[in-house]
């Protein structure tokens, strides 16, 4: 099968490489976001999918807005005769003229069990909501985002210690396995599919920068889920002694709850464990954190270096 591939970040590059190595497909071209400056450098750098495509000498197309540049895109893609377009974390919505351009239209790998968690942040939102399982969906692309018919789904378990980084790895592995499984069934005809139960749809939006700021008046479980949902891409943050403090890794504490809690109050336990009181009276144990302008550290290192005082708080 001859395909065009649309994607941008690291996990999408992993799927691209799996498709190339599978020998089930011939990747004719890749479409990815334009090069962007990374870190402190002002020099634009190619993203992971572009790097992987160039490694295999696959033609790469980049558009600032594929919607506005769709005529050019269609002209570019017209140089090839792709059977199918495969999309995974491209970063832009494809106009109908583009996703319907290939012989068998286009399929998308989505990081949830549709119709649950349609939208931009299904992996983060599953963690944020405290899900114990999620999954992937391979769907046809339709006119409305994430509403296309379903070809295949696969469940993924969420472990208590998972964060967005580790869960995204699981999602990607499940997606690779499922797409290769699907491609093995190709007989020259469109893949069979079933409509979504649109009346059961739920939605998730983009994670905003203000979502990073922790409100210690929330329940400890809510805060723990938010922290792992934000890691490693955005990082939850609070303040300590009027400076920023990033909270990287936590776990709920079994310490008995207190009446009339002081949200954000710090508690030292066994001289090397750090707990923060939350709005429900329970404690959240801080495992790893990063003070402003310093490297990440364990709670034990933080306690040794900062020597917290009675009554001090985060936030």
From Swiss-Prot:
GO terms for molecular function: methionyl-tRNA formyltransferase activity. CDD domains: FMT_core_Met-tRNA-FMT_N (cd08646), Met_tRNA_FMT_C (cd08704). It catalyses: L-methionyl-tRNA(fMet) + (6R)-10-formyltetrahydrofolate = N-formyl-L-methionyl-tRNA(fMet) + (6S)-5,6,7,8-tetrahydrofolate + H(+). One of its GO terms (cellular component) is cytosol. It comes from the Bacteria. Its EC number is 2.1.2.9. The keyword Protein biosynthesis applies. Keywords: Protein biosynthesis, Transferase. One of its GO terms (biological process) is conversion of methionyl-tRNA to N-formyl-methionyl-tRNA. InterPro entries: Fmt (IPR005794), Formyl_trans_C (IPR005793), Formyl_trans_C_sf (IPR037022), Formyl_transf_N (IPR002376), Formyl_transf_N_sf (IPR036477), Formyl_transferase-like_C_sf (IPR011034), Met-tRNA-FMT_C (IPR044135), Met-tRNA-FMT_N (IPR041711). (6S)-5,6,7,8-tetrahydrofolate binds at residues 112-115. HAMAP family: Formyl_trans (MF_00182). Belongs to the Fmt family. Attaches a formyl group to the free amino group of methionyl-tRNA(fMet). The formyl group appears to play a dual role in the initiator identity of N-formylmethionyl-tRNA by promoting its recognition by IF2 and preventing the misappropriation of this tRNA by the elongation apparatus. PANTHER family: METHIONYL-TRNA FORMYLTRANSFERASE, METHIONYL-TRNA FORMYLTRANSFERASE, MITOCHONDRIAL. This is Methionyl-tRNA formyltransferase.
